[in-house]
């Protein structure tokens, strides 16, 4: 580890921290329906969209109607994207004459982008046409991110409203998320990326002659526009197979820093949105502090492990950090930081190959996802995820002091606790059940690219990434098979909607409750004691479940490596 490396980590943290308050202020005004700087331009468009949809910003929904609207919208998006890939060969904007995508891969990809996972069992530049990339994947990048933001806002309203029956309007929340937050920021980011050298063209791939006289095809396309929402919406699916390790998708250190900040910007700002909407910004800062503790710990372990390198290589006189699978233009520090960021959020974009990390270096991204990606997390998804852990933490605190648990004046009772536990338990169910099944099926084991404990880690990482709606992978696993396309697809659906529905049920229950005034016995939720309780709850409830599986994978791999054994 070097001072320069830690300076880059601190620079990233400083930029994100500086954006939390202004972006949170703007987003709070957007979701409260207040006037913003963009209102003169966007308000007429917003009203026009409501008129076309047959709804109104004054029309609010019960949580069940909110959930039904969300499910219906996502089902339509899945069907449209699936059809687009299946009929890709006869559609326009296909200069490379890409054939139709197979049914299993189309199912997996459609589920992947609808759930904001962006798991990719294909190479974008060798499989998909420009139309599919733009009208299919990029559109879903916007609306899947907006869906997560809408769910988070609905849950926040349940805490902020004194009493009522409705949690908002899904269509209004989604339109505002897209129109006022995602779209303006992405327009700016797209222009910046083009300025930095990222391609943005509808022209065909370029054929170039190499120095040896051979012909080389250079893939280009509408990359910058997809890249902007890919990072800002914590989607992660790359235009190119190499994702953000590709020089056309991440040219230099400046673009790399912008991409890392984009991943965390909205998720971190949601803590400030929460504080503003509940009338106490200290509540939001406390949640951000808990996220920060877990994030810095993860960065420290990953950076240390990668900087220390592989002791087996040191025996050959090759000192230095682990540079396998990393880009020289980023080095160990920025590669380690990017890996922790992309798995702390539900992004999944990579600027280095996680499968080439050391055992402990790869352990941290795995744990980040298994915790439910609540360390900032995906746009919206990370925040409603950590609110589920807050419900459990407050319930435990109430039991310890013998009082009815309360959070922000709302009583946390049996129904809220059951729904929170249900949402949290669906993740290990999807991650571990599919992993266990895959390890005993010869056809699934045949896809493993590495022997020993790392081979098990490849399977565990795949299903963890799918259920956590992350999308990154240990690259040694061949995922484009019928088994993995179907089971990973179901894992993504479970990890997305079996968390969202209980979260909305909690919102529907809490919004009907009257706010109880704070008293001398009320547990303070804006100080260091609450931060410690929340961190402990996340680690114990969210992480302890996976300890046996981790012991068989990365922990065993580290011990084998330390013993000097190869596999």
Swiss-Prot record:
GO terms for molecular function: P-type potassium transmembrane transporter activity; potassium ion binding. It is a multi-pass membrane protein. It is found in: Cell inner membrane. The chain crosses the membrane at residues 5-25, 65-85, 136-156, 179-199, 254-274, 285-305, 330-350, 352-372, 375-395, 421-441, 486-506, 529-549. The keyword Cell inner membrane applies. Pfam families: KdpA. InterPro entries: KdpA. The keyword Cell membrane applies. GO terms for cellular component: plasma membrane. Its main location: membrane. Keywords: Cell inner membrane, Cell membrane, Ion transport, Membrane, Potassium, Potassium transport, Transmembrane, Transmembrane helix, Transport. It comes from the Bacteria. NCBIfam families: kdpA. The system is composed of three essential subunits: KdpA, KdpB and KdpC. Belongs to the KdpA family. Part of the high-affinity ATP-driven potassium transport (or Kdp) system, which catalyzes the hydrolysis of ATP coupled with the electrogenic transport of potassium into the cytoplasm. This subunit binds the periplasmic potassium ions and delivers the ions to the membrane domain of KdpB through an intramembrane tunnel. This is Potassium-transporting ATPase potassium-binding subunit.
């Amino acid at each position: 580890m070097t001072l320069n490396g830690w300076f880059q980590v601190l620079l990233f943290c400083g930029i994100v921290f500086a954006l939390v308050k202004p972006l949170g202020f703007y987003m709070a005004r957007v979701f409260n329906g207040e006037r913003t700087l963009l209102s003169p331009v966007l308000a007429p468009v917003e009203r026009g969209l409501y008129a076309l949809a047959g709804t109104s910003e004054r029309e609010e929904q019960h949580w069940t109607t909110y959930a039904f609207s969300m499910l219906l919208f996502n089902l339509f998006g899945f069907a449209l994207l699936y059809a687009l890939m299946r009929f890709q060969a006869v559609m326009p904007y296909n200069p490379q004459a890409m054939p139709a995508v197979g049914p299993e891969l189309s199912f997996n990809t459609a589920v992947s982008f609808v759930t904001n996972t962006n798991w990719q069992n294909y190479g974008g530049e060798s499989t998909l046409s420009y139309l599919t990339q733009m009208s299919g994947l990029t559109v879903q990048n916007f609306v899947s991110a907006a869906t997560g933001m809408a769910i988070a806002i609905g849950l926040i309203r349940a805490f902020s409203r004194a009493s009522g029956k409705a949690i908002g309007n899904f269509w209004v929340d989604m339109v505002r998320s897209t129109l006022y937050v995602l779209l303006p920021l992405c327009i700016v980011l797209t222009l910046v990326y083009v300025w930095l050298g990222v391609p943005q063209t509808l022209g065909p791939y370029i054929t170039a002659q190499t120095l040896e006289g051979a012909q080389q095809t250079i893939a280009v396309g509408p990359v910058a526009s997809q890249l902007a929402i890919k990072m800002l919406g914590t989607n992660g699916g790359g235009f190119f197979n190499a994702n953000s390790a590709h020089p056309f998708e991440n040219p230099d250190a400046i673009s790399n820093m912008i991409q890392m900040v984009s991943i965390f910007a909205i998720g971190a700002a949601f803590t400030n949105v929460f504080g503003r909407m509940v009338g106490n910004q200290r509540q939001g800062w406390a949640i951000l502090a808990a996220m920060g503790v877990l994030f810095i710990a993860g960065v420290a372990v990953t950076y240390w492990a990668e900087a220390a390198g592989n002791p087996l290589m040191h025996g050959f006189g090759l000192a230095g950090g682990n540079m396998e699978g990393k880009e020289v233009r980023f080095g160990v520090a920025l590669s380690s930081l990017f890996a922790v960021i992309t798995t702390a959020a539900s992004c999944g974009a990579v600027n280095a190959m996680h499968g080439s990390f050391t055992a402990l270096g790869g352990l941290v991204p795995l744990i980040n996802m298994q915790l439910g990606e609540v360390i900032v997390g995906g746009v919206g998804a990370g925040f409603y995820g950590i609110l589920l852990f807050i419900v459990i933490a407050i319930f435990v605190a109430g039991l310890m002091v013998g009082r009815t648990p309360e959070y922000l004046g709302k009583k946390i009772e049996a129904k809220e606790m059951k729904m929170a536990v249900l949402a949290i338990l669906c993740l290990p169910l999807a991650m571990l059940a599919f992993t266990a099944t895959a390890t005993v099926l010869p056809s699934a084991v045949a896809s493993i690219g590495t022997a020993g404990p790392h081979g098990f880690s490849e399977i565990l990482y795949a299903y963890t990434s799918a259920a956590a709606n992350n999308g990154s992978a240990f690259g040694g696993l061949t995922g484009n098979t019928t088994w993995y396309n179907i089971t990973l697809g179901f894992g993504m659906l479970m990890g997305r909607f079996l968390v969202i529905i209980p979260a909305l049920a909690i919102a529907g229950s809490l919004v009907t409750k009257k706010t109880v005034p704070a008293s001398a016995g009320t547990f303070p939720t804006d100080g260091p004691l609450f931060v410690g309780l929340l961190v402990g709850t996340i680690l114990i409830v969210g992480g302890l479940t996976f300890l046996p599986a981790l012991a068989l994978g990365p922990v065993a791999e580290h011990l084998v490596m330390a013993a000097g054994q190869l596999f």
